[in-house]
């Protein structure tokens, strides 16, 4: 195997093994390469691993849905600049392990309904937390079950959204692992 191909293989391994992601700076230091070269390799590896955007496999069976907010903190607003707003992300995780996460403009029932329609089969059963925006959004699906986090209910039989919450936590930790902050 050539040294450049070996570097790509090692780069891919480091990216995949880093639970909280890995920055191009860190991999460049570890491999003794230039950061722009590693950055380019990382993007090529990600592109090769990406699902075909034309193939939109819909999530089916039991699908967990949740939202999270990603972005800067108010303490990062300086010199009278507006406070940065966090970006809403809707996460959908099928119990078979497939998932979709999309940045949305707002978290309301219309936006969530459109997201569900695009990525989830109508025969799916949707599990959510007690968010008020979900009941209207999931109408037309096979079923809808909720867990009430306000009442400290996190699991009720097979009803939970732990997969979504775990994904959201990993998403935020990966931002911290590679970039330390988003502002």
Language model region names:
Residues 1-183:
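Residue-level recognition of single "structural anchor" positions
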